[in-house]
């Protein structure tokens, strides 16, 4: 039997390499609104889907949209109390250890508590 091997052409390899560098889908980065932007945001324009004769609670939808935006903004803020960068309203609790501990010198053995 002969040891015939099938090889790919160089132009095909280059084409495959070029294709792999292109993103498959579009990537969109979106900045979250700042607290000032959320407060300054005006209510959305009324929907064009409103039909005459239909009762509508105008304030409920606006409140839900703005409330959701504020809720999502708050979720992005970590307030665990144990991390740097938390706001002044976050208080972390650290329990003090009031028992004296003797740290042994090199070669002394186990520390006494």
Curated annotation (Swiss-Prot):
Biased composition (Basic residues): 1-12
Cross-referenced InterPro entries: GAGE, GAGE_fam
Region (Disordered) location: 1-61, 78-113
Pfam family for this entry, one: GAGE
Family: Belongs to the GAGE family.
Protein name: P antigen family member 3
Source species: Homo sapiens
């Amino acid at each position: 039997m002969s040891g015939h091997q099938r090889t790919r052409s160089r132009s095909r390899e280059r084409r495959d390499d070029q294709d792999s560098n292109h993103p498959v889908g579009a990537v969109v980065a979106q900045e979250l609104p700042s607290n000032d932007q959320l407060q300054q945001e005006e209510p959305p324009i009324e929907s064009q889907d409103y039909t005459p004769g239909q009762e509508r609670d105008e304030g409920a939808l606006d409140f839900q949209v703005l409330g959701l935006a504020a809720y999502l903004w708050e979720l992005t803020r970590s307030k665990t109390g144990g991390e740097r960068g938390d706001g002044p309203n976050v208080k972390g609790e650290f329990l003090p250890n009031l028992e004296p501990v003797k740290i042994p010198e090199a070669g002394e053995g186990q520390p006494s508590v």
